Amino acid sequence: ALPISLKQVDQDYIRILERTKQQITEFHKNQIDKSWSLYKDNGVIMGQMVRPIERVALYVPGGTAAYPSTVLMNAIPAKLAGVKDLVIITPVKADGKVNPVIVAAAKVSGVDTIYKFGGAQGVAAIANGTETIEKVDKIVGPGNIFVATAKKLSYGVVDIDMVAGPSEIGRASCRER
């Protein structure tokens, strides 16, 4: 069980999370692959077997801001695809707790466990496993340059989604003369 009751978070916010979950689910349910096979007269069997990834970690940046959208947009498709054990790794706030907004999004999304650690060291721990942390099969989610580098270095030990990091936004304008 996750370490928070949804009663600890504003109920209007919970309704927003639930509505967002419905919208994300509606979109992603159309992307679910299914196993199939063809049996030919000559005895040949052709097809595709689709099996979900067993255990996936979702990195959720924590630092100074909360990113519940990262939870929703990664956890809901994973659960729809059949991921059996979905865990979050995220840095804690200064008080040693995970932001309640992140925990609420995790509960709404069906996340199984939240680990209270992050950074490159968190990626290394979840990729390789420790005495107390079971390794995962895949790591997804954005992070800073250190997290992105740790994911890149972990590729091959575990699968990763991509080397995702901070977004850069620029604006260009031209003045006619």
Language-model features, listed with the residues they occupy:
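Active-site-proximal helix-loop elements at catalytic-domain edges
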Residues: 100-114
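Short, small-residue-biased leader/transition segments that mark boundaries at the very start
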Residues: 2, 176-177
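Mid-sequence acidic-hydrophobic segments that form the walls
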Residues: 20-34, 59, 77, 81, ...
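Conserved small-residue-rich beta-alpha loop and adjacent elements
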Residues: 38-104
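N-terminal Rossmann-like NAD(P)+-binding subdomain of aldehyde/semialdehyde dehydrogenases
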Residues: 1-54
